[in-house]
Amino acid sequence: MKQKVIVGLSGGVDSSVACYLLLEQGYEVEGLFMRNWDSATNNDILGNRNINDDICPQEQDYLDAKAVADKLNIKLYRVDFIKEYWDYVFSYFIEEYKKARTPNPDILCNKYIKFDKFLNYAINQLNADYIAMGHYAKVEFNKTTNQYELIKASDTNKDQTYFLSQLNQKQLSKTLFPLANLTKEQVRKIALKQNLITANKKDSTGICFIGERSFTNFLQNYIPNQTGDIVDIKTNKVLGQHIGVMYYTIGQRKGINLSGMSEPYYVADKDVKKNILYVCSTSDQSYLHSTSCLVNDINWILDISKYVDDINQFECQAKFRYRQIDNKVVVKKIDDNNYQVIFKKPLKAITIGQQAVFYLNDICLGGAVIDKVIK
């Protein structure tokens, strides 16, 4: 009897090809299109260029997913996780921004929606043996350690293990990543050869519910402007006005709106209580560097005692944003939920609220939220 796989069919080329490959491998395949955002329900008006369109981008994605399902002769279901997304992902996202932190909603979406609500729906409602996604990542079972390992994809430029760092053993045991050993170019070639409508569809970029528009406009739907001073962190001189410290991220250069300066300025720090945005000039970028950070809400994907000699202090690599190169670090345990991450060399623009994701070569060990940056 064939094993049944429910694919998260999003209307993009990656999930389309994932469906095709699984069919070729002999699985029983069905698609499930999920909708996590509703602009009307969520009062998403400001800057939303699609608000009056006859067909919103999400509905077009569904039509593309349906066309792929029809082409491959598989069933396609659809399900809404709009309330769940708001409760588990978006509420946290907004609360973090109100604190002038910079969260990563894609990581939370994977943890709570795609690999939890979606997974449970696929297994309990659609009788799936596995789910599959169009992510670029690998899952392998290590018989020596008796652990499912999340491993970097062959296409290192597209590798998405950073976004999957909050998953657990149960989730990995039920997940297939058919694109693990393919490059994006190879995926598009397969889609073209199979005449899939999504073959040349543009990749989605940025945060899914914002789309192609001003991030500031989007946030203004939920957080009111709070004007304050922009201050040179070195001289303490007021250089201008900002519209709210939550709209800026550490290391940001564009959009600070400081005119008449002799050189570019970067966001160096944020004081939420005083509502001050601190900036530094290009020649003073040392203010962007730090030597370590404190992290919490740690998630170890696997039993790290089977991978490191001393779980209280060990060396590994870490990424502090997507597509960043691996950085050598020492991870030092403070208690069960708090760790210090010491950098082998100073790093630039480490951002509170973002994820620190840990690797042992190509194996993703897990991730944690950056809570404090130590200069």
From Swiss-Prot:
This is tRNA-specific 2-thiouridylase MnmA. It comes from Mycoplasma mycoides subsp. mycoides SC (strain CCUG 32753 / NCTC 10114 / PG1). GO terms for biological process: tRNA wobble position uridine thiolation. It is an enzyme of class 2 (transferase). The record marks 135, 354 as: Interaction with tRNA. Keywords: ATP-binding, Cytoplasm, Disulfide bond, Nucleotide-binding, RNA-binding, Transferase, tRNA processing, tRNA-binding. Its main location: cytoplasm. Residues 158-160, 321-322 are annotated as: Interaction with tRNA. The gene is mnmA. Belongs to the MnmA/TRMU family.
